[in-house]
């Protein structure tokens, strides 16, 4: 059965335990390491990276919870991840999935948005720009609860629906996600896929890693299709409304979503960044195992200069000095015959 390794669980926890603002800065740094710097673009409300695969992967960085989870547990017997403070797998599981796909060496187009849970602010602002991906064939959002759902919202492209179903998904209906803004604006079909979380928007939320990993496997299969064979799917709107299925495009949804009104910045400052030595909220700093075996914390601005991602285990590790060119963490370098080539 596909599930997390211990290292992958640790990576998911690190993603889940950052505030939106900190996660955005970490992801900008991460994308710049894996894509050319001149192909990574960001603003206050979104990040996008131009890849070499004409499919865009989409996830949002915020969660509905007022505070980030300080405790995250993985019941390995039942293969369930949960937190008494609210897990936030909607949509940190989507962020994790995209990072794992990038770790595998694939380079699709990437979109990360902010504030989806309070009205899709990041997606709305990005949708007002011209489509930045000249060769975009279709979009995949990784932000759906459940097992094998594929949700198309108000896109009525039946060929696209059949194509996505051919990878093992089943069509269902939904209310809203980022592609509800991006697809009609850019005239490109989009789908939202299940990534294994349940009871979203509540403290009873949980994640089944097996489902998440299976979705990652299916998406990678789509991305590995030769570029010349990847179909182009246009956004085709429904001609008439279907209550309960079509996304309500007026302002009512956004007004309701804004009722969440969570303040992400009401914690006490108390963690000192090991790089700049300034104080930060606990969920604004990135924990990493240092060269002496202890845990150090770096703010998002100091991540680039002090942290590298191991090419063997995909875990972050502290650079030993400013000129450190190691691409393997200390533990992986100890493995007999380990090579960074």
Ranges and model annotations:
Residues 7-53:
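A non-catalytic alpha/beta surface segment that caps or lines the substrate-entry region
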Residues 199-265:
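His/Asp/Glu-rich mid-to-C-terminal helical/loop segments that flank catalytic regions of hydrolases
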Residues 281, 298-302, 318, 329:
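Zinc-coordinating Cys/His ligand positions in small cysteine/histidine-rich zinc-finger domains
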Residues 55, 65, 170-215:
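Zn-dependent metallopeptidase/amidohydrolase metal-coordination segment
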Residues 64, 85-164, 171-172:
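Acidic/histidine-rich catalytic neighborhood of metal-dependent amide-processing enzymes
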Residues 48-89:
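Catalytic-core environment of secreted peptidases
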Residues 281, 285, 307, 318-322, ...:
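Short functional micro-motifs and their immediate structural scaffolds
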Residues 273-276, 299, 310-313, 329:
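Short cysteine-rich clusters marking metal-coordination/redox-active sites
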């Amino acid at each position: 059965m596909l599930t997390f390794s211990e290292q992958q669980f640790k990576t998911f926890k690190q993603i889940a335990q950052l505030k939106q603002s900190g996660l955005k800065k970490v992801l900008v740094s991460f994308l710049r390491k894996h894509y050319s710097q001149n192909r990574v673009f960001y603003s206050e409300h979104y990040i996008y990276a131009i890849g070499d695969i004409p499919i865009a992967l989409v996830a949002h960085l915020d969660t509905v919870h007022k505070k980030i989870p300080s405790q995250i547990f993985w019941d390995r017997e039942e293969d369930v991840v949960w937190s008494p403070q609210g897990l936030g797998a909607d949509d940190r599981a989507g962020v994790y999935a995209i990072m794992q796909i990038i770790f595998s060496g694939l380079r699709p187009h990437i979109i990360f948005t902010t504030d989806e849970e309070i009205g899709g602010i990041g997606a709305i602002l990005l949708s007002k720009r011209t489509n930045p991906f000249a060769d975009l064939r279709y979009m995949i959002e990784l932000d759906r609860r459940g097992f094998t759902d594929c949700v198309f919202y108000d896109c009525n492209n039946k060929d696209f629906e059949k194509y996505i179903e051919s990878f093992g998904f089943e069509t269902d209906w939904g209310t809203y996600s980022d592609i509800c803004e991006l697809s009609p604006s850019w005239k490109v079909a989009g789908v939202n896929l299940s990534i294994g979380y349940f009871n979203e928007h509540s403290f009873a939320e949980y994640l089944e890693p097996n489902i998440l990993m299976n979705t990652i496997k299916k998406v990678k299969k789509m991305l590995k299709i030769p570029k010349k064979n990847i179909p182009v799917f246009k956004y085709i709107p429904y001609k008439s409304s279907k209550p309960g299925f079509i996304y309500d495009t007026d302002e009512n949804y956004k007004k309701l979503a804004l009722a969440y009104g969570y303040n992400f910045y009401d914690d006490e400052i108390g963690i000192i960044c090991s790089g700049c030595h300034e104080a930060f909220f606990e969920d604004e700093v990135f924990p990493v195992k240092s060269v002496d075996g202890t845990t150090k914390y770096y703010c998002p601005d100091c991540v680039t200069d002090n942290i590298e991602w191991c090419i063997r285990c995909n875990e972050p590790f502290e650079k030993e000095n400013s000129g450190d060119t190691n691409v393997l963490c200390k533990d992986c370098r100890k493995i007999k015959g380990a090579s960074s080539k």
